[in-house]
């Protein structure tokens, strides 16, 4: 499960930003294995096991790529336990999934997203499945940001209780 502001399926040749953080899902499902996976001995994850949640800042090539895959997509507020892939889950939360008005100071803001409370509720639902093996949180803030004071309580409360 990945909760990003962007789809994270860009390619170095087609991404508008050129930012490597916008490419991990595509690499995860087997694109360009020599770049990272082969050297580390990693195998691709099956497309049907990958689900970006809330990704909305997509380049046209990303839209076209996703249309031709088995990668599932949903919105944060539309996420339900029945749609979650079976088996153990790695949940990656990129704070740019949260509306940029709620998380000022992001280097790669994605306006129009869900609020902190909606994202915290989605995390609680995922944790309640009992199948979350690990959670990663990523955020690229400009120095001197003030968003931690807003988002911190939602994340701390959600992750501390595990539900």
Language model features with spans:
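Phosphate/diphosphate-binding glycine-rich loops and adjacent basic-rich segments that engage nucleotide
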Residues: 31, 37-50, 55-60
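Short, glycine/acidic-enriched loop or turn micro-motifs at the edges of active sites
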Residues: 5-7, 57, 95-99
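Catalytic cores of soluble, metal-dependent hydrolases
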Residues: 63-163
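A short secondary-structure junction signal
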Residues: 11-15, 36-40, 60-67, 102-103
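Solvent-exposed alpha-helices and their adjacent loops that cap or buttress functional pockets
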Residues: 17-18, 41-45, 83
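Active-site histidine-anchored catalytic micro-motif
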Residues: 1-36, 129-130
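Internal, well-ordered alpha-helical segments in soluble enzyme and binding-protein domains
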Residues: 21-24, 46, 62
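Active-site flanking residues adjacent to catalytic metal/cofactor-binding acidic residues
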Residues: 1-4, 53, 91-95
């Amino acid at each position: 499960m990945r909760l990003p502001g962007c789809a994270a399926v860009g390619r170095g040749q087609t991404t508008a930003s050129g930012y490597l953080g916008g490419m991990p899902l595509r690499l995860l499902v087997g694109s360009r294995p020599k770049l990272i996976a082969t050297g580390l001995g990693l195998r691709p994850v099956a497309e049907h096991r990958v689900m970006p949640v809330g990704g909305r800042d997509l380049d046209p090539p990303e839209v076209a790529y996703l249309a031709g895959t088995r990668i599932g997509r949903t919105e944060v507020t539309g996420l339900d336990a029945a749609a979650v892939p079976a088996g153990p889950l790695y949940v990656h939360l990129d704070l740019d999934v949260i509306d940029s008005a709620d998380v000022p100071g992001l280097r790669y803001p994605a306006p129009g997203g869900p609020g902190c409370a909606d994202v915290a509720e989605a995390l609680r639902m995922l944790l309640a499945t009992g199948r979350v093996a690990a959670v990663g949180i990523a955020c690229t803030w400009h120095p001197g940001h003030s968003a931690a004071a807003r988002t911190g309580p939602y994340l701390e409360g959600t992750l501390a209780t595990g539900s």
